[in-house]
Amino acid sequence: MDMKNITDTLNDFSDGVNPFPVEWISEHPDKVEDVLAKLSTEDQIRYAMQLRGSLMHDFINLSPNSQEVIRGLPPEELYQMIKETGIGESLPILAMMSQNQLQYSFDLEWWQRDCFVPECALKWLEFIDACDDSSIVQWLQNEDFDQKVVLFQSLIKVYKDDEMTDSYEGVEEMEHLCLDGVYDVFFKTKEPGALRRLITLLRSEDPSLYTSILEAVIWYPVTQTIETAYRWRLIRTAERGIPDFKEAMEVYSYPSPEALKIPATKLEDFSYQGGFNIAPHYPLMQTESVPFLKDVVLRLGNSPRLNTISWELVYLANKIMVADQVQPSDLETRKESLKKVLGYINIGLELGASGDLEKGARLLSHTHVLPLFQTGYQQLMTLKWKTESFLKENGSFLERLFTELDKDLLAALVVRFPRVAEVGDKKALGWRHFSSIKDVRNAESFIDQWIFHLRFARKGLGLSERTIKQYLGKCDIHENHEMMDLTNWTAMAFAHYILFKKISCAPLSEPSAKSFLEIVFLLGVFKEEVRQCDSALVDSFKQELLKLPLAWIDSDQNFLATLLNKCVVHLQQEFGRIDLKAEVDWKFTHGLCIVKNPTSL
């Protein structure tokens, strides 16, 4: 199979339909309308799902049967589009959503775990207020009664002029509404315009429901009603692959060998009320960050398995958000959770397929993505536990050797979900989830490197917490002793070897430090150029270190070479431009531990 991109593969879902260049949506909307008029609703839905955010939104609005297209989309895909576009920009979409699609959005937006959030509910009501009335009326007439009561109890107070309900407590300065001379409605919000119109609309369209809700606001016990509404919410979300916390946490259990033998899912296994059983596309659109998984998916081609993989990814990302106790209504959280899912699956798939794409395609074609995710997760937990054990045994001494970057890199490996560093657009260090075996191997190598560094510092350089504290106590040039890390202590050992033919990290006098730099640096051609260290002297020092009784293995020698290279680069950057014939102001340098008084050595 020729390699292409994910969008090309998703195009195959529409039997090759790719009706116009994407640029036409903004540049030639009239041409898009003409093309869409000739396409079936199903093809329009499939093509819409290959787009993201505002492009998808604009495409749908150009369709002559946009309501059918909207209601044919899975609620997950539609909700993702609204989050990417912004709810304020999605009013035409909201106006045409079905009751089930609206409810899916409400279930994610109005609740934070088991807590109802009236501010979020009111925000959505205000946006829906700007749309057609029919959608919200349909929702009010069909949705679970307890949820409607919870909504109104959180936003209004209701009293009647009778002996049982005429207390009118705590309504001072609240806006008031009375539509029938019976129920006095007081608004808890400062700007109740949308809520006022909703109540007025409800009484106009369904007086019986209006009365039932206001009576329930008066009489239903708040706590029990919230609990009942939450139970119904859990039932609805469970049907869409969003389980309760206990079930969601099972995704982080140890993968069982039997799980790999469970047959792959079928489309019928996923809940969907639309007329076109089309899987969401947005998870597969994110696989650019996981090349191995992406290439495996491309090898699957246009197959039913691709549909079920998409659903599995959606359901798994939802479970992850529940298990991690994060808010699924936050767009960045949704992106992060999906990246984690894809990354862990990619690691598990790479391991299971031994890096072979064809083997990976065979594995993914009949294996649920969950055990692959769990395999990737366990790899990271093994890495985390190894790091924690290493830090627990050696933490206080390591603090004396780490750079700030080393501390950050190791700290990122012991958080709840280990992270890997990456350089952003502005060359600032950022953190992301592990996404490949290469990431894991690099992190393992980093830990192994520090295991060697620790052994080298203790047995090779003769350092301990006591000796470092003793040396720093004599070093009266640097105020910030934390700036002395393993690279600097290695430079000190290099200096002692060049000057005295011994391995030591004891502080140097100013004349000794100057003599070392005069010896180790080659003469420069130009005055302003950075002078280079004499590679012959560096190699001689390396050979001397290799004589140390450290039970050297190949990786140790590689780690030593890297450490010496860092040492040389640091010396050149810090001292390579200094005029050693003049007096050196050592307090503006960093890298050598120096004392002013030679008698203190």
Region roles according to the model:
Residues D2-M96, N100-L601:
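General marker for long, soluble alpha-helical cores
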